[in-house]
């Protein structure tokens, strides 16, 4: 399933994120804020349990998340800022890291780092990466998680291309995709058009 998060706040911040005049500091803040907002939709069906708490005036019944069962796995490096934004909402979630870069010649992902919680196979995992372009990095990261026994995976990005969505759905049809926008297409270099450029470079001021 593909879920487009079209909340007005998300779309407002996404428009500013796309603007080429947005500086790295503001770009990081916007990406973090959008990720926090998108997490509301991603966690809509998380299980809760009923509890009682004592207020200053009596006993109230309430519900709490069992978010100890959640893990956030950013694809390095651009996914880090998304994970930080989500952790502001769910600070008790565990975090893993998968390092992938896209070979500029083949456009295929190359793995260079993986560090995951020991109990990752018992957790619902949210994989985050700002851009779903060719789909190669997302497919590779999810494949790594599945080899570790993870069964419940969601993928969250800010901008996606139709080609990337199709590739990810074909490789991992059991994984729901959450995105703030589906753009027009990929160019010959594998970049999303109109997109926002290279998310990692814009985040960290590199070229």
Curated annotation (Swiss-Prot):
Keyword GTP-binding in record: yes
Disulfides per UniProt: none
Keywords: Allosteric enzyme, Glycosyltransferase, GTP-binding, Magnesium, Nucleotide-binding, Transferase
Catalytic activity: UMP + diphosphate = 5-phospho-alpha-D-ribose 1-diphosphate + uracil
Annotated residues for binding of uracil: 192, 197-199
UniProt GO cellular component terms: cytoplasm
EC main group: transferase
Annotated pathway: Pyrimidine metabolism; UMP biosynthesis via salvage pathway; UMP from uracil: step 1/1
Binding site for 5-phospho-alpha-D-ribose 1-diphosphate: 77, 102, 129-137, 198
A single GO molecular function term of this UniProt record: magnesium ion binding
Entries under Pfam families matching the protein: UPRTase
SUPFAM superfamilies: PRTase-like
UniProt-listed InterPro entries: PRibTrfase_dom, PRTase-like, Upp_B, UPRTase/APRTase, Ura_phspho_trans
CDD domains: PRTases_typeI
Gene3D superfamilies: 3.40.50.2020
Superkingdom, natural source: Bacteria
GO BP terms in the entry: UMP salvage; uracil salvage
Cofactor comment text: Binds 1 Mg(2+) ion per subunit. The magnesium is bound as Mg-PRPP.
Regulation of activity: Allosterically activated by GTP.
Documented EC number(s): 2.4.2.9
Cofactor(s) annotated in UniProt: Mg(2+)
Family: Belongs to the UPRTase family.
HAMAP family reported for this sequence: Upp_B
Role noted for this protein: Catalyzes the conversion of uracil and 5-phospho-alpha-D-ribose 1-diphosphate (PRPP) to UMP and diphosphate.
Name of the protein this chain belongs to: Uracil phosphoribosyltransferase
Organism of origin: Dictyoglomus turgidum (strain DSM 6724 / Z-1310)
């Amino acid at each position: 399933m593909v879920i487009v998060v079209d909340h007005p706040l998300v779309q407002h911040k996404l428009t500013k994120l796309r603007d080429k005049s947005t500086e790295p500091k503001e770009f990081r803040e916007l990406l973090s804020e959008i990720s926090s907002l998108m997490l509301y939709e991603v966690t809509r069906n998380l299980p809760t349990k009923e509890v009682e708490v004592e207020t200053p005036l009596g006993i109230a019944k309430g519900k709490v998340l069992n978010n100890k069962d959640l893990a956030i796995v950013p694809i390095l490096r651009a996914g880090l800022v998304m994970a930080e934004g989500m952790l502001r909402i769910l600070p008790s979630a565990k975090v893993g890291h998968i390092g992938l870069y896209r070979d500029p010649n083949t456009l295929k992902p190359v793995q260079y780092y993986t560090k995951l919680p020991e109990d990752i196979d018992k957790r619902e995992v949210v994989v985050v990466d700002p851009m779903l372009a060719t789909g190669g990095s997302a497919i590779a990261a999810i494949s790594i998680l599945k080899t570790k026994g993870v069964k419940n995976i969601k993928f969250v990005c800010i901008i996606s291309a139709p080609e990337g969505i199709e590739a990810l759905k074909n490789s991992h049809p059991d994984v729901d995709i959450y995105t703030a926008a589906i753009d027009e297409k990929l160019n010959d270099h594998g970049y999303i058009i109109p997109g926002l450029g290279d998310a990692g470079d814009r985040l960290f001021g590199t070229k």
